[in-house]
Amino acid sequence: MESITKVSMSVCPFVRSTSTQALRQLSQTSGALANQARQCPIAGNAIRAKEISIRSYSSATKPARATAATPSTPEATFNVTSSFELGSKETAFDYNGYLGNELEKKRSDKSYRYFNNINRLANEFPKAHRTQEEDKVTVWCSNDYLGMGKNENTLKEMKRVLDKYGSGAGGTRNIAGHNSHAIKLESELAALHKHDAALVFSSCFVANDAVLSLLGQKIKDLVIFSDELNHASMIQGIRNSRARKHIFKHNNLADLESKLAQYPKSTPKLIAFESVYSMCGSIAPIEAICDLAEKYGALTFLDEVHAVGMYGPHGAGVAEHLNFEAHLKSGIERPEITTVMSRVDMVTGTLGKAYGVVGGYITGKTNLIDWFRSYAPGFIFTTSLPPAIMAGCSASIRYQRATLKDRIAQQKNTRLVKNNLNELGIPVIPNPSHIVPVLVGNAADAKRASDLLLNKHDIYVQAINFPTVPIGEERLRITPTPGHGPELSKQLVEAVDSVFTELNLNRINDWKKLGGLVGVGVEGAAKVEHIWTEEQLALTDADLNPNVVNPAISPLDVSSGIST
């Protein structure tokens, strides 16, 4: 009978909010309220169950013999359907209707996502074909920033390992999925960021979620400070951590410090932020954030997803770029000075953007990485990346470490596009990075602009709408690569200009009349300087330290577990 009461509590709000003592009193009285309650098919069952329980407890019985736990018998199972005497007019919850309504909401607010069938051609980069192979377009929004998806070195190594070791890893890292390719990749990543150790995940979304949630769950009283523009993966991890959190204004050091100062230095803290924010192209003040972290006793968690491969003399990201000369001189070795990169506690990155393959990772001190390896469910309970994938990632890292030409070509092509669009009054959101965000300001217009570029001009640029960006700040996100030279850039600029005219979209002067938005048309705004200087863009591979070419990198013990 106890099961009847439990089921009633799960179904009826009256029973759920009524104490056991109150139910007992109702079962022993005959007032109007009690009589009405007995008429309810749900509350009545709970009251009758309590009556039987009371009678049973009051009767003389033999002492019960203690027995081992046994499986439940069919008689002990409460059949909800038969006991509630469902009427013929009752229907089940309309699951499909609910889902349809939710989807209709997204269609109504123009945030419903349509996927374009775009098949990138390795031998014709940056070309792709649509559904029909003869229907070719130029891709201008890929995150394969350096075109490494077609790199001969990477493809050759992947094919070699695929032929020898097969298509899959065969299991988790703990059960048959750990191999020399995983050890090598983690060793390469640790060497790239000049950290002690690294750990590879299936994606950086998983890495961010797994690491941040674990830190918040395990470190008692941890307080997390998160930039308001952080990626969804970081937001998800912080939410799953259940730790106390503070959201600070984007790249606002004063706001961050005011929040850090609310806690004693002894309170564990973590500052989570990105180096390059992918939808606006802004770059974090990493060094100043490290200063605040040291002042207030906080760990630093830096997401370099949109920066690895793109910045620094060896592609380690913005943290490396901030000490460009020191890292250029030392090559694979750690510089003699304290660098920004060495001050950051944790760096997460991706192998699926500038490196052109797939996967995510985190780097840091040995104990920290071993702790994640030992405790993070997102790492422990998932199948390892295939050997061919990890081999391809290692090949990409080694290739980009030993060359500057792709990063420099990409930066030059980015500047060409930005300058030419600005000359025509196309509203490029100002930023110092490789991202070219073109402000539209309306979801429907952003979708129409993207469709026109694709269907009329054979140019694929994806519209970016809510929730990726705030409502009213919808945009087109353009990402030049080394393969987008002057001729392709000319075609793009002419096409965007044509679309803005055809749809009568706001240009820079129009936004200026409206008071400006996200840096576009803002009176008196300071000029934004690119992070790559003219001197750095003039460098060649001959300026690199020779020790970055095919270096011998020792395998990390922590990748397999450290013996004591």
Swiss-Prot record:
Its cofactor is pyridoxal 5'-phosphate. The gene is HEM1. Belongs to the class-II pyridoxal-phosphate-dependent aminotransferase family. The modification N6-(pyridoxal phosphate)lysine is found at residue 353. It catalyses: succinyl-CoA + glycine + H(+) = 5-aminolevulinate + CO2 + CoA. Its main location: mitochondrion. Pfam families: Aminotran_1_2 (PF00155). Residues 1-57 form a transit peptide. The lineage of its organism: Eukaryota, Fungi, Dikarya, Ascomycota, Saccharomycotina. Its EC number is 2.3.1.37. This is 5-aminolevulinate synthase, mitochondrial. Substrate binds at residues 113, 226, 245, 468. GO terms for molecular function: 5-aminolevulinate synthase activity; pyridoxal phosphate binding. Pathway: Porphyrin-containing compound metabolism; protoporphyrin-IX biosynthesis; 5-aminolevulinate from glycine: step 1/1. Keywords: Acyltransferase, Heme biosynthesis, Mitochondrion, Pyridoxal phosphate, Transferase, Transit peptide. Homodimer. Catalyzes the synthesis of 5-aminolevulinate (ALA) from succinyl-CoA and glycine, the first and rate-limiting step in heme biosynthesis. It comes from Candida albicans (strain SC5314 / ATCC MYA-2876) (Yeast). It is an enzyme of class 2 (transferase). It is found in: Mitochondrion matrix. CDD domains: KBL_like. The active site is at 353. GO terms for biological process: heme biosynthetic process; positive regulation of organelle assembly; protoporphyrinogen IX biosynthetic process. The keyword Mitochondrion applies. One of its GO terms (cellular component) is mitochondrion. Pyridoxal 5'-phosphate binds at residues 278, 306, 350, 382-383.
